[in-house]
């Protein structure tokens, strides 16, 4: 029967295991840094460290001789080296675990990244706000604030919004109101030159683009 070979990944776990022990003060009587600046450490009780490694991997027969053979794997790839002597000293040379982890989280004082001007999410969020404002404008108590509730305007005339020139009874459906505002926002952000044309021409363009918003027009 052939002996079970340890995979490179299993050996890499051994290296991580040792680093974990070094960072845990409760095991400082077993393994400790002899010079942390140079990443040199010493196993004060190497056989006990091997027993812990065996318990972690489900191998009760693990001993220091077997574990040290696993450590030799790292000598060949310049990841670990044995310090001369018989006091179980080793030195990390290059290990991914020792490399700093990238910071995926923005700092608190960093400015937030600007969202592109035109996006479906932005249009939907903006149209939901406008739909809510439209509902408030329909009540008698809020009629005096209707001029300030509209979010998009091309001119300062009373019919300055595409939503104003579309037959109001048709736009009782919130979905139609939302679609009208999305279209108006699209025109304002993607076709700003269209804002220079009279409102009736803008309305005609909208009728052609979205005829479902004008069910009463043939």
From Swiss-Prot:
Region named Disordered: 131-162
Biased composition (Low complexity): 131-161
Record flagged with keyword NADP: no
Subcellular location field: Nucleus
One GO BP annotation of this record: regulation of transcription by RNA polymerase II
GO cellular component, one term: nucleus
GO terms for MF: DNA-binding transcription factor activity, RNA polymerase II-specific; sequence-specific DNA binding
Main location: nucleus
InterPro entries in the cross-refs: Ets_dom, ETS_fam, WH-like_DNA-bd_sf, WH_DNA-bd_sf
DNA-binding positions: 12-93
Induction context: Up-regulated by salicylamine.
Stored Pfam families: Ets
Function of the protein: Probable transcription factor. Involved in responses to oxidative stress.
Family listed: Belongs to the ETS family.
PANTHER family assigned to the protein according to its UniProt record, in alphabetical order: ETS, ETS DOMAIN-CONTAINING PROTEIN-RELATED
Protein's UniProt name: ETS domain-containing protein ets-7
Gene designation per UniProt: ets-7
């Amino acid at each position: 029967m052939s002996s079970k070979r340890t995979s490179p990944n299993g050996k890499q776990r051994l290296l991580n295991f040792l680093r974990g022990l070094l960072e845990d003060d409760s095991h400082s009587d077993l393994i400790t840094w002899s010079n942390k600046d140079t990443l040199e450490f010493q196993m004060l009780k190497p056989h006990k460290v091997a027993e812990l490694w065996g318990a972690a991997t489900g191998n009760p027969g693990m001993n220091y001789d077997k574990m040290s053979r696993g450590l030799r794997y790292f000598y060949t790839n310049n990841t670990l080296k044995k310090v001369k002597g018989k006091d179980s000293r080793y030195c990390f040379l290059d290990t991914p675990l020792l490399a700093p982890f990238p910071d995926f989280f923005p700092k608190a004082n960093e400015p937030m990244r600007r969202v592109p001007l035109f996006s479906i999410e932005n249009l939907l969020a903006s149209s939901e706000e406008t739909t809510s404002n439209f509902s408030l404008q329909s009540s008698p108590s809020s009629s005096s604030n209707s001029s300030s509730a509209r979010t998009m305007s091309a001119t300062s005339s009373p019919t300055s919004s595409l939503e104003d020139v579309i037959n109001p009874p048709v736009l009782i459906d919130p979905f139609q109101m939302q679609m009208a505002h999305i279209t108006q926002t699209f025109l304002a952000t993607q076709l700003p030159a269209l804002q220079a044309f009279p409102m009736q021409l803008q309305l005609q363009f909208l009728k052609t683009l979205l005829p479902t918003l004008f069910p009463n027009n043939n």
